[in-house]
Amino acid sequence: MIISLTLLILSLVALYIGAGWLVQGSSALALKAKISPLVVGLTIVAFGTSAPELVVSLNATLSGQGDIAIGNIVGSNIFNIGVILGVSATICPLQVKKQLLRIDIPVMLAATVLFTILFWNGTLGRTEGLFFLTGIIIYTIFSLFYSRKHGTEGPSQELEEQPKHWAVDTLAIVGGLVVLVFASRLLVDNAVSIAKELGVSEAVIGLTIVAAGTSMPELATSIVAAYKRKTDIAIGNIVGSNLFNILTIAGSCSLIHPIEAKNVNYIDLLVMLGISVLLLPLVKSGQKISRTEGFVLILFYVIYMFWLLRDTL
């Protein structure tokens, strides 16, 4: 078990590094194209930081481990809001822009409700997968057009101060993807091994260790953004990541191969839905998430973890 745990930790570190390269390269290219920072956070950064979840869930699906694939998606969405937004808000109250309130958060909630309904019986088929993927394509195109029409913010100061050739950014993207693919395979294999040795279900491993581990890029990105007072990136990253997790990851996995995950139950789905719904009144109160509200989100996650691990603690 020590070897499996060591390899799992190393795979998480590799996922973090690979996602970092991917985000750095893709964000630089997007900003050079004069896409606004908020939309970069909602799309490029969010999708890039969710790349670990994508490759891990795809690997798990192809290996017939649906509980890890779906547990990773559900657990990551809960972790993103409860821990990442919670911690970010305690560092700096998160101001919420109108686009997030009017468009992006409602779309995320709609996707979460839809996923909960469609996965209620513990399975996702190719029809649902195609529907989800169509949704993320429409959302991404809309966000990019909206940015072009309404966005006034140009490339970030950091990008202007440190110009790089597009080839360097492309190399970072390719290198990041290669690392992600190999690290994800290592993570899934050793997560399954640890689950068997501990006598816990693969769903619990997916909802906890795998979900938290694959969310490390989002955690780092949002915390750094909060410290720099770039709260639109911090929130946009999480909202975009949660959308990506449901529409792209669940969509891709179920389109490639129908998923069955009977051990991810309705309680887990309702917790994901509940913390997502809780986000709306929080951001509407003064159009920001305060430090107190950040602590509430963290507490929500801690209570869920105690319930989930009650039989193993």
Predicted segment positions?
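Hydrophobic alpha-helical segments, chiefly the membrane-spanning helices
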Residues: 1-313
